[in-house]
Regions:
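N-terminal carbohydrate-binding/catalytic regions of secreted carbohydrate-active enzymes
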Residues: 64, 77-81, 91, 111-114
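Structural recognition of the beta-strand scaffold that forms the well-ordered cores
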Residues: 58-61, 87-92, 121-125
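Extracytoplasmic/secreted envelope proteins and their assembly/folding machinery
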Residues: 59, 73-78, 108, 120
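C-type cytochrome heme c attachment motif
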Residues: 65-72, 121-122
Length: 253
């Protein structure tokens, strides 16, 4: 009986450890791709549009302010961003979290729904390729990530457009969106859902266990827009952790 208790304790302990082992990039065949990235500062009214062929690769990083292994991963992402068309989104751990103030309930719920495991550090490229941990599969994380980014999406011809009317003292913000996309490129029974990812450009949090202090491109909230290719919606934004540098990003998946 005692050996069984010890085994269970070991399993539970291992399941809660941040992943730092080497991990081969893993194809995610069942969850569908993620694309988009046109964005606007939330305090400014305007619009942004892009051809699908010009959109950046969407790189999702699951992280936490106490995660020391995450620092190596994020520095590697910064390095490869210098030579690749990509946009980073940092999803901070929220559910069951008492040390990291930068995550959101809906961010964690989406991560669980798509990717199941909430193991910082985890990086997902275009929703289709996941690499867990901070030890490289090859010679370096930079080399791994650069290779992962070569698996570009084939989105065909089309455009993604975001319009934004900033909130005033008397009215809520309004988001409009339009996606021109060849739906023959997705399975017959599939749909494309759009959402606004509310991103804090830079947050200062000096109390994180990883000693980073400044955290970039943190996803502070997700606002679902549904599966219509175009529309308009009043939007209430979450509060920035500090400053006034929230951005609204249009994402499709």
């Amino acid at each position: 009986m005692r050996s069984r208790v010890i085994l269970i304790a070991l399993i539970l302990g291992l399941s809660t450890l941040p992943a730092s082992q080497a991990g081969e990039p893993e194809d995610l065949d069942e969850v569908g791709f993620v694309f988009g990235g046109v964005h606007i500062e939330s305090s400014m009214s305007g619009n942004s549009t892009s051809n699908l062929s010009d959109l950046p690769a969407i790189v999702e990083d699951y992280t936490a302010t106490w995660c020391t292994n995450c620092v190596k991963v994020e520095h590697a992402l910064d390095d490869v961003e210098e030579t690749n068309n990509m946009q980073q989104y940092h999803f901070h751990r929220f559910i069951g979290e008492n040390e990291d103030p930068l995550g959101s309930q809906e961010g964690d719920e989406r991560w669980i729904d798509r990717y199941e495991q909430r193991l910082p550090p985890t990086v997902v490229f275009n929703g289709t390729l996941r690499q867990i941990g901070s030890v490289p599969s090859g010679d370096s994380l930079q080399g791994d990530y650069d290779t992962n980014l070569q698996n570009a999406l084939s989105l065909g011809q089309g455009t993604s457009t975001l319009g934004w009317v900033a909130a005033t003292n008397n009215s809520s913000a309004i988001a409009t969106w339009n996606l021109v996309f060849d739906t023959s490129l997705i399975p017959e029974d599939a749909t494309i859902k759009s959402s606004i990812w509310v991103v804090e450009h830079l947050a200062h949090f000096p109390d994180g266990g990883n000693q980073e202090e400044y955290y970039h491109e943190s996803v502070r909230g997700i606002i679902e827009l549904g599966d219509s290719m175009s529309g308009s919606m009043e939007v209430t934004l979450p509060t920035a952790y500090d400053g006034d540098d929230l951005e609204v990003h249009l994402i499709h998946e």
